[in-house]
Structure formats: structure tokens, C-alpha cells
Amino acid sequence: MMNTEGNNGNKPLGLWNVVSIGIGAMVGAGIFALLGQAALLMEASTWVAFAFGGIVAMFSGYAYARLGASYPSNGGIIDFFRRGLGNGVFSLALSLLYLLTLAVSIAMVARAFGAYAVQFLHEGSQEEHLILLYALGIIAVMTLFNSLSNHAVGRLEVILVGIKMMILLLLIIAGVWSLQPAHISVSAPPSSGAFFSCIGITFLAYAGFGMMANAADKVKDPQVIMPRAFLVAIGVTTLLYISLALVVLSDVSALELEKYADTAVAQAASPLLGHVGYVIVVIGALLATASAINANLFAVFNIMDNMGSERELPKLMNKSLWRQSTWGNIIVVVLIMLMTAALNLGSLASVASATFLICYLAVFVVAIRLRHDIHASLPILIVGTLVMLLVIVGFIYSLWSQGSRALIWIIGSLLLSLIVAMVMKRNKTV
């Protein structure tokens, strides 16, 4: 465990610093990529799905906050797995699954970047090969950026958090004045399948709250500040998402939504803010998605470096290739590109949502096992675990009933993580 005293003495973070980190991590590319997908499923009830997604995130955030407060380190969820589950096959499999989850998320966001780029640069076109070209191109560019620079990643993110928030708030404020109640009134409750599918997808828009736990070792009084920070950050983000969902559904027709699901936020900007506003929102979406790919690649490469130092990856994966890049970096990037080409945005969102939910369910298990050490409430953890389990079962069942091929990729991700972990254990790599 890191020496927290040294960190605390050097510019300790306060409540609003941590809240800013959380909001910045959650309110990013995900909402640009996922709002349209959620609206396709729930239509006028989309805001309800974001509200329930926020409740699930609140429970999960509680477990994260207690663990982060008691075990402050920058290792995040990987460190939690090791502490609560040991260094066995199961812990390693979950770490690998989380790594895969981030890879799928990058592919999803790259798809969103491609959709916005085509919408902006080739107005009216939805050519698949153009979307894929831009998606693969941004992955390649950001991989190169990560290979060349370590420090620019953080600087870029700080600037873009402010830009993203300003654009979204501008859109919401403009939308409030022109809300059309008839478009957002819930005439009939959604089917259970659509509801659970949408909850799974909307939870992905909150998944960034885990980044706050990585800052716990820099907080002056983590036992007090971390739980409050998670509550405030997730609460504010929930209100923002609900407002944005109401605005988009009020101003984008069902026909447009079906046609432009991947760029729904930009479609809402056009009638509200005119062409100039539309351009601003699209540019904001391109910046947000590009920076998210950059930041997530940075996170993936750091996790791989961490796992390599713990001998949890084959030696080849950490072998230097060029500048800061390794063979492992290239292998993961190729895998990301293959997933980007093989799956559409909706399928990628489903895979990432399911694997995120499974990883965060494991965090509940860790928190329950360590509840006495982290001073956590067992009833809250049990309720959170049951809620998360219900969402996972409902989400997987909805995918199965729809015959979604994303289910095959989800099962494949689970099996691949488990098999690789077992093989490495057997070969005494770990």
C-alpha cells in the first residue's frame, strides 16, 4: 500500500477536487455515444433508465468509496481484487476481464467518433466504411500519441472536461425553454426486456466514477471525503443525464432517432442552437470521444504495466518495442481494432456494459469480505449486490431473448479471461 502520509502532506485534495475528478470521468464520451442507443430502447422513458442507472451507480459507488478510503492507492479496482480475493485464478481472471472491458469501451467510443466525424465531414452520409475508417484512424493516432507522450494525456483531459461540461450545459439550458411535453410523456411502461437492456447501457455512462478511488491516496481525510464525493458526483451526473435525455427526446423525432442513434446529441442541437450550435456540439463530441480514447488507452497501458510488474502477464507483453510502447500495447490495440470492425456501436455498448457490471459486482464481493476493515454497512452492501445482480441477470436475459450476438462476445470475454488466467497459473507465470 502506498504511503498516504507523504501524499497528504503535499497539496491534499478536498471534497470538490474529488467531485470534479468524478464528474469529469463520468460526463464524457459515454453520453455522446450512449444516449441515442438508450433512447432507441426506452423512447420517452429514457430519463427513467438514467435515473435507475444512477441509483445502481450510487450503490456501487458506496462500495468503491469505502474501499478507496481504507486502501488509498492508484491501483483502483485491480488492487481491490488482489486485496479481497488474493492472487489466485479468480482475481487474475477479473483483472483480465476489466482490461478487456476497457478495450471494448475504447472500440465503442471509437465507433462514436467515426459516426460524428462522418456526420460532420460527409453530411447526410452514413457509409459504414467511412465510419470504420475514422474509428480505426483515431485509435491509431491516439496509440501513437500515448507512445510519444506521457504527461500530455493528463493536461489534455483537464482542458476537455471544461469544454464538454460547457457544451452540454448550453444544450440543456437551451432545451429547457423549448421542451415539448407531448414528446416526453410516458404513455405506456416499457417492456421488461427494454428496461433491463437500457439500464445496462445507461450504467456504462456512469462507469467512470471508479476514477475517484484512484485519487484516494491524495485526499486529506479519505474516510470522510470519499463517501461524500461519490454521493455528490454521481448525484450531479444523474441530474445532468436526466436533463439531457429529456431535452434530446423532446427535440429529436423518433424517425431521426432511429436514423441517427449514434449521434443523437448532435441532432438535438440543430433545432435548439441552429447550425452554429450543431457544429459546436459535434466538435465537442469529437474532442470528447478522441480524448476518452486517449485517456482509456493510457489507463489500459498503465494497468498492463502494473500487471506485468506483478508477473500477471507473459513477459512478452512488457517487452519494449518503440519509445514507451510494448508488444503488449500493440497486441491490445490490434484486438481493439478487430472489435471495432466486427461490432457496431450498440453491440459494443452491450458487451462493455455487461463486463463492467460483472467487474463492479465483484467489487461488492470484495467489499463484503473486507467490510470490517473498511467500516462498511453490510445491509447497504447486500442491497447493492442484489440490485447489481438483478440488473446483470435482467440485462443478459434481455440480450438472449433478442438473439443479440453481443451475448457471444460477452461469454467469449469471460471464457478468455478465465482460460488465460488458468494457463498462466498452470505455467507458474504468476
Language-model regions, residue ranges each:
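Select transmembrane alpha-helical segments in multipass membrane proteins
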Residues: 12-22, 55, 86-101, 134-138, ...
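TM-loop-TM module centered on a large, flexible mid-protein loop between adjacent transmembrane helices
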Residues: 76-87, 119-123, 231-294, 312-347
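Hydrophobic transmembrane alpha-helices that form the core helical bundles
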Residues: 37-40, 59-139, 143-147, 282-306, ...
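A generic transmembrane alpha-helix motif of multi-pass inner-membrane proteins
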Residues: 174, 179, 368-372, 376-430
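Membrane-interface loop-to-helix entry segments
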Residues: 117, 130-178, 189-191, 230-234, ...
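Membrane-interface "cap" regions at the ends of multi-pass membrane proteins
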Residues: 1-45, 58, 62, 417-430
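Helix-loop-helix junctions that connect adjacent transmembrane segments
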Residues: 3-10, 47, 124-133, 158-278, ...
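Transmembrane helix-loop junctions in multi-pass membrane proteins
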Residues: 31-35, 110-113, 145-151, 180, ...
